[in-house]
């Protein structure tokens, strides 16, 4: 079947359809505007060297463009959305950002609002992203908390170094998206940018876009756990960053609309190295997947639950299984499939290359993937399995613990030919 006409600004019905439009965030000062002491707080393991990280990210973006992909940037769309929304939207955005930064009211709130409010929208967005240090404001707080408890902390508003992982704050599913309540405080403000873009940017506003789950929840879900396997099946990781109750929420909403009828929940280890499903498992062709051997138990077992609509609206049926290959073959109606092990299954190589995002491949067409060049064992294995591998440079970007899939939020893909 030929590609269907795309009338919605969001059209993403698979992990592997030819990528047409993607959302990126070019690394800015936020990735170096912190100290080693702040790394645990900001969920980072290292501090990238910004000039090289930017060159690497530009190479990544150019690789996508060279393959026919339209590249949009979060920082630009955010400012354009505020421009389009006018003063009321700008004020609401700033108030919400200050509230979520810990300043719903008070003298610090007022000082920050005056400082940020004096900027144009583009400069304000960039400054919020890179963080606001105390020495930037001509202001001395008088409250006891600031004077007695937080006097040695350098920031009023923390930087957001994880923003270049645009996969996580939102996930485009079908003709809609989830705008995610993220797990850790360090990242929870990020999805406010996505919400603002969807509501007010002329490209997306008032276009009938489904919001499958908004950010105003207490249960956690992140886009790295959300895999759109085809036009009616999703896989979602039960992980450090995504909870089972959030998966049930989004499944009910998808089923109610009728676009999707199956969600496969896959339980992975709850740790930093394997924070999302896409750090250990990705779809790269109709019948091919990467998988990190470290998530599989004896005999290749892993807990999965296939969720389908129940008899009554809002009810869910669950089918537990530990044979991932069988579950995928059944859900995707495949006779067989190819699970390609990270690092060729070698325990040392697999562990090293998974840490450097060897499992985090981005498919830009069926059988065509973008990977980090540093994971040479996994890359060569992919080629031996018939895939076209486009390597991108990665010495600094990889320090953030995310690969090509993490750094990209597909907005439009061509439909798969049936």
From Swiss-Prot:
PANTHER family: ARGININE DEIMINASE. It catalyses: L-arginine + H2O = L-citrulline + NH4(+). It is found in: Cytoplasm. NCBIfam families: arcA, PRK01388.1. Keywords: Arginine metabolism, Cytoplasm, Hydrolase. It is an enzyme of class 3 (hydrolase). GO terms for cellular component: cytoplasm. Belongs to the arginine deiminase family. Pfam families: ADI. The lineage of its organism: Bacteria, Bacillati, Bacillota, Bacilli, Lactobacillales. Disulfide bonds: none annotated. One of its GO terms (biological process) is arginine catabolic process to ornithine. It comes from the Bacteria. This is Arginine deiminase. The gene is arcA. Pathway: Amino-acid degradation; L-arginine degradation via ADI pathway; carbamoyl phosphate from L-arginine: step 1/2. Its main location: cytoplasm. The active site is at residue 406. GO terms for molecular function: arginine deiminase activity. Its EC number is 3.5.3.6.
């Amino acid at each position: 079947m030929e590609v269907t006409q795309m009338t919605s600004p969001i059209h993403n019905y698979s992990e592997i359809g030819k990528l047409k439009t993607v959302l990126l965030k070019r690394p800015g000062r936020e990735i170096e505007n912190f100290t080693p002491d702040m790394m645990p707080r900001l969920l980072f393991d290292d501090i990238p060297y910004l000039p090289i990280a930017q060159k690497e990210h530009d190479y990544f973006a150019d690789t996508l463009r060279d393959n026919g992909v339209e590249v949009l940037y979060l920082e630009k769309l955010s400012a354009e959305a505020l421009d389009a929304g006018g003063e009321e939207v700008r004020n609401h955005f700033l108030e919400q950002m200050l509230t979520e930064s810990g300043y719903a009211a008070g003298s610090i709130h007022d000082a920050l609002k005056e400082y940020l409010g004096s900027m144009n929208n583009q400069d304000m967005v960039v400054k919020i992203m890179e963080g606001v240090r105390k020495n930037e404001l001509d202001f001395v707080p008088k409250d006891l908390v600031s004077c007695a408890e937080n006097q040695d902390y350098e920031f009023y508003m923390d930087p957001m170094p994880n923003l270049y992982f645009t996969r996580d704050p939102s996930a485009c599913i079908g003709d809609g998206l989830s705008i995610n309540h993220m797990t850790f405080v360090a990242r929870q403000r990020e999805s406010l940018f996505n919400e603002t873009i969807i509501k007010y940017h002329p490209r997306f506003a008032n276009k009938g876009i489904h919001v499958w789950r908004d950010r105003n929840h207490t249960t956690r879900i992140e886009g790295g756990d959300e895999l759109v396997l085809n036009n009616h099946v999703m896989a979602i990781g039960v992980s450090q960053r995504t909870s089972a109750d959030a998966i049930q929420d989004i499944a009910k909403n998808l089923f109610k609309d009728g676009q999707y009828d199956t969600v496969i929940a896959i339980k992975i280890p709850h740790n930093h190295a394997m924070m999302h499903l896409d750090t250990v498992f990705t779809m790269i062709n109709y019948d091919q997947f990467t998988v990190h051997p470290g998530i599989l138990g004896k005999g290749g077992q892993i807990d999965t639950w296939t969720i389908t609509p129940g008899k009554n609206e809002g009810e869910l049926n669950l089918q537990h299984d530990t044979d991932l290959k069988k579950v995928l073959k059944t859900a995707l109606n495949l006779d067989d499939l190819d699970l390609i092990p990270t690092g060729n299954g070698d325990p040392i190589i697999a562990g090293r290359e998974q840490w450097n995002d060897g499992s985090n491949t981005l498919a830009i067409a069926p059988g065509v993937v973008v990977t980090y060049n540093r994971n040479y064992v996994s890359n060569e294995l992919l080629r031996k399995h018939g895939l076209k591998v486009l390597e991108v440079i990665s010495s600094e970007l990889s320090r953030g613990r995310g690969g090509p899939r993490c750094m990209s939020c597909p907005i439009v893909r061509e439909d798969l030919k049936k």
